[in-house]
């Protein structure tokens, strides 16, 4: 009769044995420190994806991450819009940080982590549920005949949810459809609880732990052929009755009995010796032969020896009978030891093929009762049989053994003499190294005795050959023969320590493996779900949901606290100045700053988990630092603007209406248009503020505070590139407008004068042009030049081209960079001093540079030359009204900074600035400036002078004077009223014309004649003629080559060797 014996007398080890009479055929041992992890369900997080392995590594709570192959990933973890074309790519399926529910398919072995799967399987008494694998399912392969047909009909009547698979176990044979449906409903309830628990906590943690050894034994081994279940512990007996009832096997409750005999349970049935055989390498056979089982990293090798076997009439019969016995014992040992993987059996050689087939059939019949899947091949011509067995759990040796600290698992150690000679060679090798003072050898006692006695002369020879090197050999009784340490001590590192104290000194370097780490037992992790106490109501999740209502009102409360009404007086004056100046023009939107920021912050916090927002946040952070870096320059610019703003009294009545409109627009504006709206607002704000009149000095401090408040509440939006906020307004004006310039009026200000350091003093000579568009300010040119310099001298691109159109553009850009270099290969200073350049033998080729860039560089040089220590800012009262007039075809005076002689005792350098830069472009045709042209310019100025009408009586507009080309540089220049300046400049131009007969001015172009460097007159050297003549070649010979033309021949007849007598 078959029995199940459960030994629980020792709490450190629980053993379950299945016996048939007194023959042990299955064994399961579990220790508290070696619980089985296979079939445990975890919630893990993907930490790394390896496309080369087509797998992902998952952190599920263990020290070593699990291995999740691509084929073990369920379809439910694929992206919603994923469409597989051929072989799927794991990077398209999974992403790092994704949380998955995994089950351990193979436990950790050696250096390999656990193999995981997302196809969960929940094993019950009669059924195995595959909740996310619809392709899996069927009936156990052991069930055959009519039982299989009945189970198919029962399966058809079960209510299985869509997308799930079901397997009927062997224990389900003969069960009714109601019993199968009850087990199925239990598994479905279990799966729902697993999903609920997975949603309650973040990964990684253990959701479901596989049952202990008793429950597994009841679930896997309880069959109708089990006659009784004997347990030697009353507490375990009560626990077993509960498990039987929970598993739905009430028919076995009567078979559970308590063993109360004096003899231990396993000894009573004489299976202790059989259990011990499962831990031994060699197992004896009844006939006298033996089998030897060796487990390696790759496979398990089993060798069969006849040994003392004498059964049989001849050697062939003896080999055949021994192999038959070995086949039965091998099948039994595989179950007892739970060996899995590849197994190779070396049977005793058998000549007849029928004997080989008989042994194969005996082995197949012996493993039929094994739960694991087994595949067996035929015996090869070398007498080897290959088979594979499913690894259900760690083998008996892996769960109860550890690697030997002495032999490191090899089973052998090196001989003392061989090890001593190896240490001696290593000592000499260390002594040969440079800067070696001592060599310390810490060795076991037998090795030290051999080196200090038998090999004393060899040690002395090493010290003699290596002058100054001292060999110290120290015996250590804590060491065993395979281990030793040879340490090299450099000069200056030696310590005055006694030799027998060296092992303690080098204790860290030796670091012998301790056995304490094997004795450590980790505290088992508690699962989130109880195994058998399955509640009808899923477990309540962790208190994460109540936090949602607290977070939700946060974005709604943000817009309710506008930042604009904080200082109504400042904003009213600011809006009043803008409204009064433009009189109902385009409305400004400075109060949009606080509203978008109040809404953007909660929005960005909500999008923290979106991976596509990471780059945008990075750009915002970079922009924050850039704005802080340029805060000082922005404040200075704002101060200059605010001084030019006029205080208006009529704006206070419009404050409430504008505030309501701006707030409404800010709330209803789309978030996608926030960056564009911010950029347009800044450009409009800069243009308008550039035209504002100067504010009174009593409100200057308040304006500075308002500017700082505006900078603080300005929303941070991603921009392509930070732009300089000094853009000027461009207008088209007629000849009369540009020619009219009011006289310069110096105003005395009661307050302390403000000294500006940035711009240098500039003077402008007004020209009479055709109707043209005004030139931009030097600041704008510098900005454009800076942008061009950033882009390698080329215009900045507004956007990035599509990826599929980018290759040819890159090729053109590379060709352009190579064809037109931005730097000269030879420095200009060296070229000017070179006589070869002056004589025309060497030419430097430069890239095409716009004339505007050349003029800007010349202006910079002029500004550097004319910098003076004292600079006084004098506002110029001049108002210009647009006048539309017909084109006037007159010559245009070039903008020239010339010395102006003033008969005053103390000349001063006066800087005049104007927000509108009026610099007329010259005509395209180069023309010569004459006196008549200057007179015409004066007449036009006089005729256009009465047209001037000031827009506002209190408006003080400063004139920005632009410099162009330096003719004569003087240390001091004073700006005078417009009309006299024109006349004096004309005279100056006459004097210049006396030196240079013709001065041509081209459109946006500046030239200068080439100045020859002082060098002696170049006289080319006459070519040299040589008198050498090629000698005539006289050929002597027959005019042919080869053996047939030879004149001398030598030959030798073949000689026969002399015979040896």
Swiss-Prot record:
Which cofactors are named for this entry?
Zn(2+); Mg(2+)
Location(s) in or outside the cell: Cytoplasm; Cell inner membrane
Q: What is the effect of changing residue 57 to A?
A: Reduces RNA cleavage by over 98%
Outcome of gene disruption? Essential, it cannot be deleted. In a temperature sensitive mutant at non-permissive temperature, slow processing of the 17S rRNA precursor to 16S rRNA; a double rne-rng mutated strain no longer processes the 17S rRNA precursor.
Q: Name the InterPro entries for this protein.
A: NA-bd_OB-fold, PNPase_C, RNA-bd_AU-1/RNase_E/G, RNase_E, RNase_E/G, RNase_E_G_thioredoxin-like, S1_domain
Renumbered to this chain, region (Interaction with RNA 5'-terminal monophosphate) spans 169-170
The entry's Zn(2+)-binding residues are 404, 407
Membrane topology of this protein: Peripheral membrane protein
Q: Where is the S1 motif domain?
A: 39-119
Variant or mutagenesis effect after changing residue 303 to N: Reduces RNA cleavage by over 96%
Which residue ranges does the record annotate as region Interaction with enolase? 833-850
| Presence of the UniProt keyword Repeat in the record | no
One GO biological process term is: protein homotetramerization
Q: Where is this region: Interaction with RNA?
A: 57-112
Identify the Pfam families for this entry. Answer: PNPase_C (PF12111), RNase_E_G (PF10150), RNase_E_G_Thio (PF20833), S1 (PF00575)
Tell me which EC number(s) this protein carries.
3.1.26.12
Q: Which SUPFAM superfamilies match?
A: Nucleic acid-binding proteins
In which domain of life is the source organism classified? Bacteria
Molecular-function GO terms, alphabetical: 7S RNA binding; DEAD/H-box RNA helicase binding; identical protein binding; magnesium ion binding; molecular adaptor activity; ribonuclease E activity; RNA binding; RNA endonuclease activity
Subunit record text: Component of the RNA degradosome, which is a multiprotein complex involved in RNA processing and mRNA degradation. Within the RNA degradosome, RNase E assembles into a homotetramer formed by a dimer of dimers. Tetramerization is essential for catalytic activity, but not for RNA-binding. Interacts with RhlB, PNPase (pnp) and enolase (eno). Interacts with DeaD at reduced temperature.
Q: What PANTHER family does the record point to?
A: RIBONUCLEASE, RIBONUCLEASE E_G-LIKE PROTEIN, CHLOROPLASTIC
Please provide the record's free-text comment about the domains of this protein. The N-terminal S1 motif binds RNA, and can also bind single-stranded DNA (in vitro). The C-terminal region interacts with the other degradosomal components.
Under which name does UniProt file this protein?
Answer: Ribonuclease E
Organism from which the protein derives: Escherichia coli (strain K12)
